[in-house]
Amino acid sequence: RLFMNENDEVTKDISEGLKYIKNTKEINNVLLTGGDPMILSTSKLEPIIKQLREIEHVRIIRIGTKVPAFNPFRILNDPSLLEMFRKYSTNEKKIYVMAHFNHPRELTPQAIEGLNALMDAGVSLVNQTPMVKGVNDDPDVLAELFSKLSFIGVPPYYVFLCRPTLGNETYSIPIEKGYEIFEKARIRCSGLAKRARLVMSHESGKIEVVGMTEDQIFFKYARAANEEDNARFLAFYRNPDAAWFDDYKEAIEEFSLFTKNETNVVTS
């Protein structure tokens, strides 16, 4: 995270980060987030992209941005931005723009034109959105968003459940209600619009909500900080008031394909 102030995850000097990425050959995928990288001028953004592209093992550069939704003219009126993408998003090493469209009304003609300009410049696009109370916490609205995105070639990627922290608690949705909204939206969509996953960005990893029964709710680690949690499946008794993963106190069952030292061993 490079662009926000007063945050332990943020840095204004990216040289150490670039050095770490260069020296860590396991890294093939880098995400620029913040803040919003595309608020930067092209003259400030391009050197970062250039240095990342010069690292041989970095195959994908991702840019998390709301710009295509709220200011598509940043794309449409800056030929140098599109030229930068043409230069550094290559046939074998793509740049992905992780767009943040939260409501179908944001998909204006100008926004769609901007998205097409990015695609014409060789950029791959996906969309991710938080589920926001009063904005898209409605199956019809979410289904319309998924469908419209699929129609224009922007696959739905993640729907995030928001942790209820100071400042956003008003907009957060309980996990089980969010799952119900999400699944009702998906059944209103055709196949290509169904690809989103409902997740939480938890300190222990990215946790997907994968199902519910009358009594239980099920989670799976889509990505984990600890190796033994990779693909770990967990079942809890339902708690309709739970707003975050930590509100489920004790798993009634869990299963992992991996142990810390033996990734080919099944454990339970």
List where the protein language model places each region.
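Auxiliary Fe-S-binding modules of radical SAM enzymes
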Residues: S147-S268
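Acidic-enriched, low-complexity/disordered segments with a strong bias for Aspartate over Glutamate
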Residues: D8, D13, D36, D78, ...
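Short coil/turn segments at secondary-structure junctions
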Residues: R1-N5, D36, E169
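Canonical Radical SAM [4Fe-4S] cluster-binding loop centered on the CxxxCxxC motif
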Residues: R1-T11, I63
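Conserved AdoMet/S-adenosylmethionine-binding subsite of the radical SAM
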Residues: I14-N23, I27-N29, M38-C189
